[in-house]
Amino acid sequence: IHLAAVEGTSICIGSDCMLSHDINIRTTDSHSIVNLKGDRINPSQNVNIGNHVWIGLGSVVLKGSWVPDNSIVGARSVFTASKAIFSNCIYAGVPAKKVQDNINWTRERIKEKKI
């Protein structure tokens, strides 16, 4: 897991989270982007990961992101800042989008479907 928090920003990870291998969580773009007047237009922003979140293999969580409680970020996804995010969902893709709702996850391997 690679964490990059700079310029007074923070990465907050809630309780009972499961983080896979090769994850990158960043509050910064690493380099400044400026408009033609010379003003920086890409400030660093906090990252918040809720409680009971599972982040899959090779995923990237970018500045300004808030990953909601009880959610899953699919393998190799890029989670970016979003205004429409909901708990108990699976987010996947580049950029990550909601692909399933009304879910939760457990570390337990359940062998049979519960009816």
Map each language-model feature to its residues:
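Flexible, glycine/small-residue-enriched loop-and-beta-strand segment within the central core
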Residues: 1-66, 77, 82-83, 94
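Terminal amphipathic alpha-helical/low-complexity segments used for targeting or macromolecular assembly
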Residues: 16, 32, 52, 64, ...
